A protein has these predicted regions:
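Extended, helix-rich structural scaffolds rather than catalytic motifs
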Residues: 1-2, 45-217
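Long alpha-helical, hydrophobic tracts
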Residues: 1-58
């Protein structure tokens, strides 16, 4: 029991630490939520509550499915995203998770559905309008906000007084292997005015371009 709790904590911490790296944050969160869902499913089955187990399984599938679509959304917003832009502004999005770990899945679905609705509507409008309606901090709240709120939970109470179902040791080994993997920092594009000028001025012979003074250039 303590082994799985420790791994969930590590996964949430890793997602939080890499909130500026879309893929790493998404991957760590997906694994952590899968482990938590697996625990809840097995507990429901042990208590002979198949309907509850099915409900948890469906909710878990929807959330991880949504997480896989995150790169598509961030492609549209990439030019306007800063890693720490809204890290302190997500409280309103994740307030429900302060009451219960179970609510985290509901909050994730709620946030995603709102973002998806905005995305679908704005695809028919100008890109600039989309930037105003669906700001980047909404995405930041979706992933890093939830993982941060979850990390604050006392995970021990999550499994307290319950016979913990054993999760496949192979899967736990894979999780540990992922946790040990180093995350390479993302390459940041830097603006090079000189290179941009040379590209713009390519094809002109020096002195023949009347729009740019060769001496100044």
């Amino acid at each position: 029991r303590q082994q799985i709790i420790a791994k969930i904590k590590k996964l949430l911490a890793k997602a939080d630490d890499n909130r500026g790296n879309f893929n790493e944050c998404k991957l760590a969160m997906s694994i952590a939520m899968r482990l938590m869902a697996q625990y809840k499913i097995e507990q429901a089955e042990l208590k002979d509550k198949p309907a509850e187990a099915q409900k948890v399984a469906e909710r878990s599938f929807k959330t991880t499915k949504h997480a896989r679509e995150i790169p598509y959304i961030t492609t549209i917003m990439r030019d306007h995203f800063q890693a720490d832009m809204a890290y302190s502004n997500y409280t309103a999005y994740v307030y429900a998770t302060e009451d219960s770990v179970d609510n985290a899945l509901y909050v994730a679905e709620f946030l995603y559905n709102n973002m998806k609705a905005a995305l679908r509507a704005e695809k028919r409008k100008a890109r600039e309008r989309f930037r105003l309606v669906c700001e980047p901090d909404f995405y930041c709240g979706f992933m890093s906000g939830i993982c941060s709120a979850l990390k604050k939970q006392e995970m021990e109470t999550f499994a307290e007084n319950e016979s913990y179902a054993i999760i496949c040791q192979t899967e736990l080994a894979l999780v540990e292997e992922y946790l040990q993997r180093e995350v390479k920092p993302k390459e940041v594009h830097t603006h090079n005015p000189l290179k941009d000028y040379e590209s713009f001025n390519r094809g002109y012979k020096r002195g023949e371009n009347t729009t740019i003074n060769p001496a100044i250039a």
